[in-house]
Amino acid sequence: MLNIFSLICLNSALYSSSFFFGKLPEAYAFLSPIVDFMPVIPLFFFLLAFVWQAAVSFR
């Protein structure tokens, strides 16, 4: 599971600087690190579901 997560993080970091994605306008350039991290955020909710179920003993 950790390998999949690290692979996704690595891929999002590599492809975020790719020519396939557009650059942010200069006015929003300070938000660039947040925008690079945003594709990974849904995975945290997915992992949170497993942590929550483990906390309640998978009822």
Curated annotation (Swiss-Prot):
Main location: plastid
Key words, A-Z: Chloroplast, Membrane, Photosynthesis, Photosystem II, Plastid, Reaction center, Thylakoid, Transmembrane, Transmembrane helix
TM regions (residue ranges): 30-50
UniProt keyword Plastid present: yes
Entry membrane topology: Single-pass membrane protein
Gene Ontology BP, a term: photosynthesis
Record propeptide residues: 1-22
This protein's GO CC annotations: chloroplast thylakoid membrane; photosystem II reaction center
SUPFAM superfamilies per the UniProt record, alphabetical: Photosystem II reaction center protein K, PsbK
Xref: HAMAP family: PSII_PsbK
Function comment: One of the components of the core complex of photosystem II (PSII). PSII is a light-driven water:plastoquinone oxidoreductase that uses light energy to abstract electrons from H(2)O, generating O(2) and a proton gradient subsequently used for ATP formation. It consists of a core antenna complex that captures photons, and an electron transfer chain that converts photonic excitation into a charge separation. May be involved in PSII dimerization.
Family under the similarity heading: Belongs to the PsbK family.
Subunit-level organization: PSII is composed of 1 copy each of membrane proteins PsbA, PsbB, PsbC, PsbD, PsbE, PsbF, PsbH, PsbI, PsbJ, PsbK, PsbL, PsbM, PsbT, PsbX, PsbY, PsbZ, Psb30/Ycf12, at least 3 peripheral proteins of the oxygen-evolving complex and a large number of cofactors. It forms dimeric complexes. This protein, PsbL and plastoquinone-9 are found in PSII dimers but not seen in PSII monomers.
PANTHER family the record matches: PHOTOSYSTEM II REACTION CENTER PROTEIN K, PTHR35325
Name of the protein: Photosystem II reaction center protein K
Biological source species: Spinacia oleracea
Source taxonomy: Eukaryota, Viridiplantae, Streptophyta, Embryophyta, Tracheophyta
